[in-house]
């Protein structure tokens, strides 16, 4: 059984690297590059590159949740993790673990919002019967949602960085 928990730690760390790395790539490299090219080309590139990110993000979030709770069980704190006593009595252990948990939970929420916005507004195609007015309304809605999406990407990247900080604090033992 010890091998299972060692493997879960490896999967947990790898998933964190994939998630945080893809978020930093999106914010620091992809978005600025897309803003420098014409909108039609930008949309095509974003759709192709984004397809991989839309798989990597949810998959790594799911793996982080699964392996995170397995790690809590392995540490023997899963039963008391959601109690006030754990936060007050074991705060040196609780702070980095809760930082990771809250970041993960918020990333799951914002990731779901991003997916809904993408599917409902950004990726939806207009019908063939659409006129110029429909096209302009669609473009305005896409521009508005794209602005929200860019801000949400910054929030997600910050949350990913905080979760990584929690993991680093926990594994380094700096708070002990």
Task: List the predicted regions and their residue ranges.
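Polytopic transmembrane helical bundles with strong interfacial aromatic enrichment
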Residues: 1-176
């Amino acid at each position: 059984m010890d091998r299972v928990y060692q493997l879960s730690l490896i999967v947990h760390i790898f998933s964190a690297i994939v998630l945080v790395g893809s978020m930093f790539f999106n914010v620091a490299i992809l978005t600025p590059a897309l803003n420098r090219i014409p909108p039609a080309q930008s949309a095509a590139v974003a759709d192709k590159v984004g397809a991989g990110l839309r798989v990597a993000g949810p998959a790594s979030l799911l793996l982080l949740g699964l392996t995170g709770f397995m790690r809590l069980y392995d540490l023997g704190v899963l039963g008391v993790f959601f109690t006030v006593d754990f936060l007050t009595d074991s705060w040196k252990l609780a702070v980095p673990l809760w930082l990771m948990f809250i970041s993960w939970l918020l990333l799951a929420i914002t990731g779901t919002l991003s997916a809904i916005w993408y599917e409902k507004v950004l990726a939806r195609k207009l019908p063939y019967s659409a006129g110029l007015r429909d096209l302009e309304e669609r473009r305005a809605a896409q521009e508005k949602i794209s602005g929200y999406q860019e801000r949400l990407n910054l929030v997600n990247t910050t949350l990913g960085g905080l979760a990584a900080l929690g993991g680093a604090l926990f594994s380094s033992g700096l708070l002990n």
